[in-house]
Structures are given as C-alpha cells and as structure tokens.
C-alpha cells in the first residue's frame, strides 16, 4: 500500500472522530484572542494523540511537532486558525452554537478539526517520512492585527525553522470533494479607513449659514475613487469601498459632522502605502477647500498573500495524485484578505481552498453568514489531503 493510500485509509478510519471534533468546536465557538476553551480542547486532543506541544503563543496559540526519521532534514508547518465570529447562528443542527451571538461562520472549526485529523494521521505514520512537521494552531485570524503576526513575533516558525507553511480554507463556492490552488499572488491586503468630516450644522432651509458636511463627504467619496482609477496601475488589482455613511441630521437639519467607514485592498505593498497617503491628503484638502475639515484614521490590516510559485505547483500536483485531476481546480484572484498572508512574507507558503458545497444537503451559504455550514464529507478530505501535502513537501525539492 502506497503512503497516499495509507493516509486515505487512516483519514477514513478517523473520519467520525474528526467530525466529532468539528462539531464540538462548532458548538463552542469563541471570539478572536478569547479561544481559551478551544485551546484547552486542542491541547487535550494532542495529548491524547501523543504529540508534544507548547501552548501560550499569543495567549491561546499552540505549536506542536511531529518528528519523522531524520527530523533535521526539513521542516514543514501546517496552520489552522481557531477563532469564531460575532454572528448569531441560524442553523438548526444538533451542534448549533451554545454561545449566543458567537458562531464559527468562517469555517475555522473545520480548519482546526482538519489539522487535528492530519496531526493524528501523521503521528501514526511518522516512521514513514523524513523531517519534521510543525502544527500551528493560531488564534485571532478575524481581528486586526491578526494572530499570525503575533505567532510569528513569538517564534512559532522558529526552533526548528519552518522552510514552508501550508494552510487551507473552506470555500462554499467549490463542491465538496474538490480543492482549489493558485500560484503567485492570490489575496489582497486590507486596510480600514475612518473619516470624520466636520462642518457647521443648521437649518436645511438656510444652507448659506452652514458648512454642509454631508455635501463635503459626498464629494470626498466620489473624488477618492479617482485615486484608484487615475493613480493606480491598472495591472494591480485595487478596491476602495465605503460601506458606512452616518449623517445624523433630518430632512431639514444639516448635521455638524459625518462619519464614513470603508476599506482599501490591493496586491502591491508600495502602491498600498502610496494610495493610503493619497487618500489621507485628498480627504483632508478637499474638506478644507470646502470650508470644513476631515479627520482621517487608517487602521493597517493584513498584507497581500502570495503563494510561493514552485511550492504551490508542487502542492497542486500532490493534490492531483491524491484526489485526481478532475477534483483539483485553478483559483482566480480573491480580493478578500487573510492573516495567513503574514506567513507568506516570512517563508514559502501555499494557501489553498477546500470545497464544502453540497446543494442537496443545503450547504450553500457563504462564509460570514448566519446559515453557513458545510458538507462534513469535506473533513475527511481536509485532514487527509493536508497530511499528504505535508509529506510530499518534505519529500520533494521545488
């Protein structure tokens, strides 16, 4: 029996255990950097599997090691995030969230359960591969500045140094049984923009006595789009979107100030820095030119995510070996962001997608919605494929 077949066999053997882990995690979600019970559960399972670990990274993070033969030969890390979102779950399932207003609506329960499953499989096969596999259970992916940034600062990729890191993420647009890969640039950076436009409020019938912040804010929003369309290189994907505009006046009341919130996303760090400076300068100068003022606050989020080309090609080939060519898809650029991006700026990285969609079972909702759920057939694939990719990355040069 080949190693791939042995991994598939173990994934099938442990499938119900992996599902049970996922359902426990789903029923007991915790918000970013508050994953205390989740961390305790992961530690309990690692102890049960006989895998040594160190806890306490960024509060709740865990790093474990599985040493094969010749453990110093090569080190590959696998990452799973553990936090949930502040969403009220609307799924009617036995494992529905017990924590009101908190839900695993982004699939991090799947990621953690898959990594635990991969860990169990790899530990049982550690005499069959050379090198070391590092397991990174990470908190706080959903909250800036991102748990990955803290894990890196606290040495999660060191001692021994990881030459590569792999991560997977659920994708409800991809049918269960299939996975997706993309080599090179994949996901965008993400920065939050907060504008407070100040003027002088008053009666709507006497605009000459006021400095209208609603009008100023409207001009600012339109003008800022010119930064993307006329300053940005059209070959660099960029998005500037504003989703919150608060002007607490009335039909005949001009307010004193307007608050605007939005996001800027791109895939080039130099352009990112330049664009943010231009956004600040244009908002401030336009407000001043119209008689008001604009306070600009920019919260820097995650950098862009780039999949190492050769590593990603290797992983795609390995996925074809494991699942068949018909079940491995090529992904397009994705303007969402992920704090796995921090790892991609530290070492060779491959971030791929795990299909979870099954229309017959009603598993069709997108992530970050109250009805998001998966076809749990994906868990056996998620755990087994991650184990296989780790082994192939150890085995092959790229």
Feature map (PLM): residue ranges:
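Histidine/acidic-residue-rich, glycine-tolerant segments that coordinate divalent metal ions
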Residues: 85, 91-103, 110, 116, ...
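Metal-dependent amide/peptide-bond hydrolase catalytic core
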Residues: 215-398
């Amino acid at each position: 029996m080949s190693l791939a077949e042995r991994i598939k066999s173990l994934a099938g053997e442990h499938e119900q255990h992996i599902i049970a882990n996922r359902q426990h995690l789903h029923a007991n979600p915790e918000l970013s950097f508050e994953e205390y019970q989740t961390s305790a559960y992961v530690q309990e399972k690692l102890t049960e599997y006989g895998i040594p670990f160190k806890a306490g990274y960024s509060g709740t993070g865990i790093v474990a090691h599985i040493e094969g033969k010749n453990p110093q030969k090569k080190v590959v890390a696998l990452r799973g995030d553990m936090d949930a979102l502040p969403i009220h779950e609307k799924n009617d399932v036995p494992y529905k969230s017990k924590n009101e207003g908190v839900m695993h609506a982004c699939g991090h329960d799947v990621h953690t359960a898959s990594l635990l499953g991969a860990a169990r499989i790899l530990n049982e096969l550690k005499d069959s591969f050379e090198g070391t596999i590092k397991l990174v259970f990470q908190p706080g992916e959903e909250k800036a500045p991102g748990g990955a940034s803290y894990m890196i600062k606290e040495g999660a990729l060191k001692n021994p140094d990881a030459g590569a890191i792999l991560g997977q993420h659920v994708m409800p647009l991809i049918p269960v049984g299939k996975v997706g890969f993309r080599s090179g640039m994949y996901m965008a950076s993400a920065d939050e923009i907060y504008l407070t436009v100040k003027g002088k409020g008053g009666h709507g019938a006497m605009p000459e006595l006021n400095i209208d912040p609603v009008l100023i804010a409207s001009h600012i929003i339109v003008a800022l789009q010119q930064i993307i369309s006329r300053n940005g290189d059209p070959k660099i994907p960029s998005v500037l979107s504003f989703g919150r505009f608060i002007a607490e006046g009335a039909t005949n009341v001009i307010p004193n100030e307007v608050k605007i919130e939005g996001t800027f996303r791109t895939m080039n760090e130099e352009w990112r820095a330049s664009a943010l400076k231009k956004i600040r300068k244009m908002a401030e100068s336009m407000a001043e030119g119209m008689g008001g003022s604009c306070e600009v606050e920019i919260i820097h989020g995650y950098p862009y995510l780039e999949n190492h080309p050769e590593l990603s090609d290797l992983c795609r080939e390995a996925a074809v070996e494991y699942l068949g060519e018909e079940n491995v898809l090529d992904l397009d650029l994705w303007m969402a962001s992920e704090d796995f991006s921090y790892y991609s700026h530290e070492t060779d990285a491959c971030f791929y997608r795990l299909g979870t969609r099954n229309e017959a079972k009603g598993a069709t909702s997108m992530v970050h919605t109250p009805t998001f759920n998966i076809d749990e057939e994906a868990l056996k694939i998620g755990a087994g494929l991650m184990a296989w990719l780790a082994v192939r990355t150890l085995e092959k040069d790229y």
